[in-house]
UniProtKB/Swiss-Prot annotation:
Extracellular side: 1-66, 130-141, 206-228, 514-525
Topological domain ranges for the Cytoplasmic compartment: 91-103, 164-183, 252-490, 546-589
Region (Disordered): 275-295, 323-356
Name under which the protein is recorded: Muscarinic acetylcholine receptor M3
Gene: Chrm3
Length: 589
């Protein structure tokens, strides 16, 4: 038998003659393949095979300069893909700031892109240059399995990231409490398992299901994708449907972020105006935690801390939110409450914050001693946020109790700043109360007396400044949270945009090929498929452009500054340890 091949082709360069006939069996293949009937003319006039195809030409019909150009370009892209995704993985390992739930999904995406850069790109380049598959059927099926599983895993990871961002924005209280690294690992595992189950068994064992292998020798493509209708269906399920879902989710994320931005701007604009009006309530409280049921659990525990000119009594009270309030929190988690209790609850619901009990939480009442005065502001019974009355023009008077034993006030501004920083995170309650102790001869009883003493204008201004500082801290925390969400949304938008740009041309050609099997030149097929690979090259660039932490860590790794960073961190910890030990006796006073 004599084997004659009437095809001499160079897929990437259309100026070289090609007699490939594009039949329905070639639809949607990564490389324009030759149908078995049109590629091979079997002649029985000779006892041996003769061939005029490129099987004996290692360059596949290309010129030497074409081979150099193809090898250099594709090799460079593969190298950039490998280095970029290795940087992502190593950066995640060495920088603890990157070990967030959202970045676990990016780590999974980087692993899929790394597989494509190491295996898929190089084998496909060899296939293009040689213009035939010379590694055998088993290697062909393994390559296709790895290629399609990794590519589909990239799509699934993008889908998971989109849903994660969507629920984080729209359900910050309910979803973030469940958003842990363990659940992220489960979602990542499902993405890979689903991708493997969908593609690997069908690619590896389809020839055994149908009883024969229809892929001709020297070619490599998925056997069950020989029909355009099947190829069309897989394109819809693997690309168009996920892209549609991700686009809708991103649009919802964008609208919700814009809504949050307007709400925060309104909160900041009305904050200064409403502060003077609501600072003193007719009942003595501008805001209250009336929506929560305060429940005293036994004896109150109080402790005293001293920071500079501020003296604090932290009185622990346990409280449980009412059933009605819990329902409101779960049903309308999008709204931003203006009270401090709701703000603290919203912040505690984040997975990045400190874990708090599901039912019982702690409220700390702060007792403030104004510098240079012998009075102390103490917490009282009402659970108000800033229950303060001062002798201003528009304000009332403030009831305070005189302390019999005057406390020494330290006027260190640094310690005062630390004082403000410590209680700015808590629902602050400024009220008037002090206890004066009268010790009897037997030291058996302690009496507490109260007296009304108006504050001076200077002291009232200072107290009001503390309340304004607290409100600004709450607004700042909301603003920082919004900025963080915007950065995550920007990263998602960049990744999604790169995915759509790189994957759309090939999938459009798949749709066109369903109705016109000879309208797409082989060069376009190969370029379109390679463009899908380039998406794995672009993703690390998106991380660096949209995330400053990734960018600085990449720079540190490329410049080999890991050891310097570790030494600086150790030196900083040693300095902090010395400072801490020096301050221990002072804090113990």
């Amino acid at each position: 038998m004599t084997l004659h091949s009437n095809s001499t082709t160079s897929p990437l360069f259309p100026n070289i003659s090609s007699s490939w006939v594009h039949s329905p069996s070639e639809a949607g293949l990564p490389l324009g393949t030759v149908s078995q009937l049109d590629s091979y003319n079997i002649s029985q006039t000779s006892g041996n095979f003769s061939s005029n195809d490129t099987s004996s030409d290692p360059l596949g019909g290309h010129t030497i300069w074409q081979v150099v150009f193809i090898a250099f370009l594709t090799g460079f892209l593969a190298l950039v893909t490998i280095i970029g995704n290795i940087l992502v993985i190593v950066a995640f390992k060495v920088n603890k700031q990157l070990k967030t739930v959202n970045n676990y999904f990016l780590l999974s995406l980087a692993c899929a892109d790394l597989i494509i850069g190491v295996i898929s790109m190089n084998l496909f380049t060899t296939y293009i240059i040689m213009n035939r598959w010379a590694l055998g059927n088993l290697a062909c099926d393994l390559w296709l399995s790895i290629d399609y599983v990794a590519s589909n895993a990239s799509v699934m990871n993008l889908l998971v990231i989109s849903f994660d961002r969507y629920f984080s924005i729209t359900r910050p209280l309910t979803y973030r409490a469940k958003r842990t690294t363990k659940r992220a690992g489960v979602m990542i595992g499902l993405a890979w398992v689903i991708s493997f189950v969908l593609w690997a068994p069908a690619i590896l064992f389809w020839q055994y299901f149908v009883g024969k292998r229809t892929v001709p020798p020297g070619e490599c493509f998925i056997q069950f994708l020989s029909e355009p209708t099947i190829t069309f269906g897989t394109a819809i399920a693997a690309f168009y449907m996920p892209v549609t879902i991700m686009t809708i989710l991103y649009w919802r994320i964008y609208k919700e972020t814009e809504k949050r931005t307007k709400e925060l701007a309104g909160l900041q604009a009305s904050g200064t105006e409403a502060e003077a009006e609501n600072f003193v309530h007719p009942t003595g409280s501008s805001r209250s935690c009336s929506s929560y049921e305060l429940q005293q659990q036994g004896t109150k525990r109080s402790s005293r801390r001293k920071y500079g000119g501020c003296h604090f009594w932290f009185t622990t009270k346990s409280w449980k939110p009412s059933a009605e309030q819990m329902d409101q929190d779960h049903s309308s988690s999008d709204s931003w409450n203006n009270n401090d209790a709701a703000a603290s609850l919203e912040n505690s619901a984040s997975s990045d914050e400190e874990d708090i009990g599901s039912e019982t939480r702690a409220i700390y009442s702060i007792v403030l001693k104004l510098p240079g005065h012998s009075t102390i502001l103490n917490s009282t019974k009402l659970p108000s946020s800033d229950n303060l009355q001062v002798p201003d023009k528009d304000l009332g008077t403030m009831d305070v109790e005189r302390n019999a034993h005057k406390l020494q006030a330290q006027k260190s501004m640094d310690d005062r700043d630390n004082c403000q920083k410590d209680f700015s995170k808590l629902p602050i309650q400024l009220e008037s109360a002090v206890d004066t102790a009268k010790t009897s001869d037997t030291n058996s009883s302690v009496d507490k007396t109260t007296a009304a003493l108006p504050l001076s204008f200077k002291e009232a201004t200072l107290a009001k400044r503390f309340a304004l500082k607290t409100r600004s801290q709450i607004t700042k925390r909301k603003r920082m949270s919004l900025i963080k969400e915007k950065k995550a949304a920007q990263t998602l938008s960049a990744i999604l945009l790169a995915f759509i740009i790189t994957w759309t041309p090939y999938n459009i050609m798949v749709l066109v090929n369903t109705f016109c099997d000879s309208c797409i030149p082989k060069t376009y097929w190969n370029l379109g498929y390679w463009l899908c690979y380039i998406n794995s090259t672009v993703n690390p660039v998106c991380y660096a452009l949209c995330n400053k932490t990734f960018r600085t860590t990449f720079k540190m790794l490329l410049l080999c500054q890991c050891d310097k960073r570790k030494r600086r961190k150790q030196q900083y910890q040693q300095r902090q340890s010395v400072i801490f030990h020096k301050r221990v006796p002072e804090q113990a006073l």
